[in-house]
Structure formats: C-alpha cells, structure tokens
C-alpha cells in the first residue's frame, strides 16, 4: 500500500501519490499561500520587526516551554524594537499570558483566540518563525518565511520539504533517529543555541 504508518515519510508519500493521481512527473513541495493584502495591512499596528513565536503544539512533549521563550526574547539586545506574535491554542493561553506579563503587551500579542484564516495574515505580516513544530511553522515556511523549528519528538519528515525550514535539535542527536517517541528534554536545547541560529535574522 502507498500509505503505511511504519517508516512513513509523509511528504514523500504525499508527493508520490499526487504525481501518480495527476499523472505528473514532478510535484514541487514548495507552494504559495495567498492572502488579502488589505487584511494584512489592517493588522499592522507599528513598524517594529515582527516575529512569530510558536509556543503552542499538539502535545506537551513537543514544547520548548514558555520560560525558555521569555529568556530568548530577553537575549535580544533590541527586543523592545521587536513585536512578538505568540502562536498557540486555547490550551496555552496561560503560557502566552505569562510571556506577555514578563515582556509587556506593547511587544507581545497572543493569537490563542484567532481563526486559522486570521493567523495566516499575522504570519504574512511577520519576518520569521521561531518555535515548536506546529501548523504555524508549516504555513510560515510555505509563505517564504525563514522558520527555525525546535524538534524534540518530531520526525525529520515534518521539516524536510522546504528551503525555509531550519532545524534546531539537541546536541549530539541524530535527526534520523528522532521519532514521536523520542521525548527529548526541552532544556537540552539552550537559549544560546536558538539565539545563535536566529540572530542574523533579527
């Protein structure tokens, strides 16, 4: 069968399926997501650089943790000249609020209550994505945004299909061995590690 769970590479399987069904030789894995430019402009509150922080995720074992995001923000010398969109769901609302309380609402906004159709406009307005593997990272990379994905128990295939995807994994870990059962310690990815990866984009 084409789709089987064991050793499944999601992107390659979907690519093969699409090529077969549409009878085409090469199906690109980069796409284009269109937005309403007027809706995007209406969201612009200031001229600060915009960063999406993907603090939410599908489960606790894939999250880097709100305290790490607070420390990362403070690591930037110019963080008061950056606006952070905190991408998360209702379950992470409290984590988002803790970040806002620490950093200040003039530099943070939670997207916990936004629809996906609205979230894509916030991403379009932003410069880069930093965060957990989440739907936001997939949308961001397909909108041409540099994405820095913190991988703790996410297989390689989830960040293997776009030139905009940049992986951050714990030192000494082979990305080919990371699976949904890896449950790597979030604190093995240091603040400095993430900062050094993204600083040239800030």
Regions found by a protein language model. Name each.
Residues 1-202:
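Catalytic machinery of carbohydrate-active enzymes
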């Amino acid at each position: 069968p084409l789709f089987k769970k064991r050793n499944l590479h999601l992107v390659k399987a979907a690519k093969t399926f699409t090529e077969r069904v549409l009878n085409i030789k090469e199906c690109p894995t980069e796409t284009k997501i269109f937005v309403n430019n007027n809706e995007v402009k209406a969201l612009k509150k200031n001229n600060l650089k915009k960063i999406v922080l993907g603090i939410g995720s599908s489960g606790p074992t894939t999250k880097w943790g709100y305290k790490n995001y607070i420390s990362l923000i403070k690591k930037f010398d110019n963080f008061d000249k950056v606006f952070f969109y905190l991408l998360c769901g209702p379950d992470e609302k409290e984590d988002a609020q803790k970040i806002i309380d620490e950093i200040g609402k003039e530099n943070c906004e939670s997207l916990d209550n936004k629809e996906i159709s609205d979230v894509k406009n916030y991403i379009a307005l932003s410069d880069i994505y930093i965060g957990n593997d989440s739907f936001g990272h997939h949308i961001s990379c397909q909108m041409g945004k540099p994405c820095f994905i913190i991988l703790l128990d996410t297989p390689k295939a989830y960040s293997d299909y776009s030139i905009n995807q940049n992986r951050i994994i714990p030192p000494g870990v082979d990305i080919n061995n990371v699976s949904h059962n890896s449950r790597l310690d979030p604190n093995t990815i240091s603040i400095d590690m993430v900062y050094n990866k993204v600083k040239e984009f800030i």
